[in-house]
Amino acid sequence: MAESAPLKIVFMGTPDFAAASLRHLLAWDGCDVVGVYTQPDRPCGRGQQCRPSAVKMLALEHGLDVRQPVSFRDEADVQALRDFGADILVVAAYGLILPQSVLDAAPMGAVNVHGSLLPRYRGAAPIQRAVMNGDAVTGITIMQVVKQLDAGPMLLQKALGIGCDETSGQLHDQLAELGGRLLVETLARLRAGTIMPIPQDDALATYAAKLTKADGLVDWNRTAVEVHAQVRGVTPWPAAYFTLRREGQKDVRVTIEPGTIGPLLEQPAVPGTIVGLVDGAIAFACADRTYLVRTIRPADKKPMTGEAFWCGYLSRCEGECPGFAVCEGA
């Protein structure tokens, strides 16, 4: 292909992370997005109304041809993909397993935008797991797609630092933009023939499992640094939560926003115990020191300050909040 010829691209993606990559492609004059694939509209929110994906909304705004197959088991869907005549497929958080027939539908194959420094954190939740594990650095990898999950040869990588108070939601937005920029650079170099794929070292691979609501259950038996990493990693979803036990009253499930690491415990305390109010923040005992929470939300209530929570709820509380006793997914 001549370097000056725009790449004909079929884009495959679904959520906001993917929409950022599509937005960068649409702003680049080196390609022509000839088709877009995204997951079918699905019910979401309290009203369970069907809503289009972020990628679909962006694609329709630009008048692009949007397809939403449930899978590619039907040969007719694979043939419809071939009929676009794309040079290359670009995949970003699509959410469907792509059979070899799909990967072979374009002469240059398929490339993927992945939110980690592969081979670390292959899988569905690389951004959240990096934060939850307390990593200081993560990044974006653009790699070729193969049948094995996130195991294809790497084309380009770029690292990004993780702030000590940064949530997975904040990191997601930064990585989404970085991914879009790195994608365009990768495609430009592929078009020019100036990039060499690098195989991944499978021995260094780790897996980032998809998050569930149970991942938000705060484990106060961990150190305050580890608790802070967990709370940041599950913000905004599924959110950090635990159960507050109040004498003579029903237990109350509460969610918390990321707080700060407090001072060392002055005396031993059972992890999960509320040990005081510090500058308007509720102080929870962890394995080594306190964790200070300034915003807390009881079930079915609006968020409130730590001081308001102290006055409104803890006057009738036993003073112990053993989150580790909560039923998973409750």
UniProtKB/Swiss-Prot annotation:
One of its GO terms (cellular component) is cytosol. Pfam families: Formyl_trans_C, Formyl_trans_N. It comes from Nitratidesulfovibrio vulgaris (strain ATCC 29579 / DSM 644 / CCUG 34227 / NCIMB 8303 / VKM B-1760 / Hildenborough) (Desulfovibrio vulgaris). InterPro entries: Fmt (IPR005794), Formyl_trans_C (IPR005793), Formyl_transf_N (IPR002376), Formyl_transf_N_sf (IPR036477), Formyl_transferase-like_C_sf (IPR011034), GART_AS (IPR001555), Met-tRNA-FMT_C (IPR044135), Met-tRNA-FMT_N (IPR041711). It comes from the Bacteria. Transmembrane segments: none annotated. It catalyses: L-methionyl-tRNA(fMet) + (6R)-10-formyltetrahydrofolate = N-formyl-L-methionyl-tRNA(fMet) + (6S)-5,6,7,8-tetrahydrofolate + H(+). Attaches a formyl group to the free amino group of methionyl-tRNA(fMet). The formyl group appears to play a dual role in the initiator identity of N-formylmethionyl-tRNA by promoting its recognition by IF2 and preventing the misappropriation of this tRNA by the elongation apparatus. Keywords: Protein biosynthesis, Transferase. Its EC number is 2.1.2.9. The keyword Repressor does not apply. It is an enzyme of class 2 (transferase). GO terms for molecular function: methionyl-tRNA formyltransferase activity. The gene is fmt. (6S)-5,6,7,8-tetrahydrofolate binds at S116, L117, L118, P119. This is Methionyl-tRNA formyltransferase. Belongs to the Fmt family. PANTHER family: METHIONYL-TRNA FORMYLTRANSFERASE (PTHR11138), METHIONYL-TRNA FORMYLTRANSFERASE, MITOCHONDRIAL (PTHR11138:SF5).
